[in-house]
């Protein structure tokens, strides 16, 4: 786990926290998460019906600015804008072959927001994942094992990018949630 700690030292080198320091950080009693990223991006120009991940990569300053505002408002955790960055959702936009590059770059934007923020506080980045929009077999055609692999793939890219932890959110199916955490 590469957990960024107060971003850089006086030499400009990135500083990382240990597992014990991470556990102490989350045990402090409360963590303030960032806000409603999708709706705030729409207020700042992201049209409906586009691939949010692609739009953010085309307009990185919008996301970085929004996340800097969250930090300055007191957020301890930024969600990387990887909400629907799984292979199935990206395939809807013809972007499945870019899953690794997109997830790494999107997480990197959150780290950039931390670097640019005017704070001495430690801020963490969570890799954010959600449902695929596909129904699992026998209701749908998606085998459970394939769904596990889809989530493992996205999580793997987020871990490569250095996120501090993974958030699984907005799941409508207990089985899909289970696949994401396996």
Residue ranges, per PLM feature:
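Domain-level signal for soluble alpha/beta catalytic cores
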Residues: 4-182
């Amino acid at each position: 786990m590469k957990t960024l700690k107060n971003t850089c030292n006086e030499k400009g080198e990135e500083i990382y926290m240990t597992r014990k320091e991470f556990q102490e950080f989350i045990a402090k009693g409360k963590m303030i998460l960032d806000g409603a990223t999708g709706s705030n991006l729409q207020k700042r120009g992201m049209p409906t019906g586009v691939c949010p991940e692609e739009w953010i990569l085309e307009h990185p300053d919008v996301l970085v600015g929004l996340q800097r505002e969250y930090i300055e408002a007191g957020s301890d955790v930024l969600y990387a804008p990887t909400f629907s960055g799984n292979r199935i959702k990206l395939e809807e936009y013809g972007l499945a072959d870019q899953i690794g590059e997109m997830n790494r770059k999107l997480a990197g934007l959150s780290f950039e927001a931390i670097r640019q923020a005017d704070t001495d506080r430690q801020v963490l980045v969570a890799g954010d994942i959600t449902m695929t929009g596909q129904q699992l077999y026998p209701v749908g055609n998606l085998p459970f094992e394939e769904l596990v692999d889809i989530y493992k793939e996205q999580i793997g890219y987020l871990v490569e990018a250095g996120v501090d932890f993974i958030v699984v959110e907005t799941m409508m199916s207990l089985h899909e949630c289970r696949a994401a955490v396996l």
